[in-house]
């Protein structure tokens, strides 16, 4: 390398390196305040039912256009983890700062710095302008590489950052190559863990539109297994994902072929939490609606015993749904009234 151009590249490299060193200083300075910040200021639970849940998710019809919907964000303006590059939660990094942060994330092996950098990137990815900038800077594979990390907290923070980045449809094109890996982590990792919830939330975001839903075909039975064994938060998050799939007629046969334990029908009992009960009722309704679209009717002999088809079309399921017409909650009763004619 020689001449003015070579000198310019050297100067640019030194400037970027200096900026990254400053990022390291700002991030590591947070250690002196104590690592407790990372634990206390946790991201919003991925499984918690939000107030004002989209009507489309609970009423058997889509409240979203074909290309958009209700996205699952891991950071809200009211409950953001601390942005450790500055003291303010509301500051938005510019493109140059984001580039330095991505360089730092890619070059450091310090787990504390990695985690803090991922939190900062995740916070900034909550803003639409930065979702595009991070993609254009090549940041998506840098963040996604951290879902391979052995540190579970780092893996979770990487998934959370991808959750916010996935709100951008163009970003999904780059994120989709990691769907299989995320599925493997979700179904092989600890039940009800933060990593599992973060992974389920990312899969939910990636299935808001129909574009990438087919990539989950081979994992549908696993989803139902997690649904039946997980806690309340996990159940709600799995159901959000299943509802996305159930609105797409192209996924109906795959859902009905899934092998599902008969304990699934217990989710239609009257004592089940409302946020779960409404969603399993909507799942039933969506599948029934899809079966009728353009004469797309299922033929019973094509489904094996033990499949979701046999559970939903059996008399036990019909009896449980009819019994809910006397449910104490008005929303549940209203939902049941609309479903009974379809039984």
Swiss-Prot record:
Q: Where is this region: Disordered?
A: 43-83
**What GO terms describe the biological role, i.e. biological process, of this protein?**
negative regulation of apoptotic process; negative regulation of intrinsic apoptotic signaling pathway by p53 class mediator; positive regulation of growth rate
Compositional bias (Polar residues) at which positions?
A: 64-82
UniProt keyword Mitochondrion, yes or no: yes
Q: Write out the GO MF terms.
A: DNA binding domain binding; p53 binding
Which SUPFAM superfamilies is this protein grouped with?
A: ARM repeat
Residue positions where Phosphothreonine is found in the record: 85
Transmembrane region(s): 5-27
Summarize the protein's role: May play a role in cell survival and cell growth. May suppress the transcriptional activity of p53/TP53.
Q: What is this protein called?
A: Armadillo repeat-containing protein 10
Provide the species name. Answer: Homo sapiens
Primary gene name: ARMC10
């Amino acid at each position: 390398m020689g001449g003015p151009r070579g000198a310019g590249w050297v100067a640019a490299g030194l400037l970027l390196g200096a900026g990254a060193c400053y990022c390291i200083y700002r991030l590591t300075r947070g250690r002196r305040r104590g690592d407790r910040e990372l634990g206390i200021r946790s991201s919003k639970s991925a499984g918690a039912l939000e107030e004002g849940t989209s009507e489309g998710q609970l009423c058997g019809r889509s409240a979203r256009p074909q290309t958009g919907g209700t996205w699952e964000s891991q950071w809200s303006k009211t409950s953001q983890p601390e942005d450790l590059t500055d003291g303010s939660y509301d500051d938005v990094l510019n493109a140059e700062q984001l580039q330095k942060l991505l360089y730092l994330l890619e070059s450091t092996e310090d787990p504390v710095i990695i985690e803090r950098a991922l939190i900062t990137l995740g916070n900034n990815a909550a803003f639409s302008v930065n979702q595009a900038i991070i993609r254009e800077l090549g940041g998506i594979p840098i963040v996604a590489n951290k879902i391979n990390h052995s540190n579970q907290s780092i893996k979770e923070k990487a998934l959370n950052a991808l959750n916010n980045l996935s709100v951008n449809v163009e970003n999904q094109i780059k994120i989709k190559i990691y769907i299989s890996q995320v599925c493997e982590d979700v179904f092989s990792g600890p039940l009800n863990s933060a990593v599992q919830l973060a992974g389920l939330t990312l899969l939910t975001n990636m299935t808001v539109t129909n574009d990438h839903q087919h990539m989950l075909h081979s994992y549908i039975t696993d989803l139902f297994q997690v649904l039946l064994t997980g806690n309340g938060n996990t159940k709600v998050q799995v159901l959000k994902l299943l509802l996305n799939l159930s609105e797409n007629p192209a996924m109906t046969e795959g859902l009905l072929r899934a092998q599902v334990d008969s304990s699934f029908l217990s989710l239609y009992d009257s004592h089940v939490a409302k946020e779960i009960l409404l969603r399993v009722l909507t799942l039933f309704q969506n599948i029934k609606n899809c079966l009728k679209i353009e004469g797309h009717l299922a033929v019973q002999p094509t489904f094996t015993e033990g499949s979701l088809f046999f559970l939903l079309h059996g008399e036990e399921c019909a009896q449980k749904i009819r019994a809910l017409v006397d449910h104490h909650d008005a929303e549940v009763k209203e939902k049941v009234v609309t479903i009974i004619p379809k039984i």
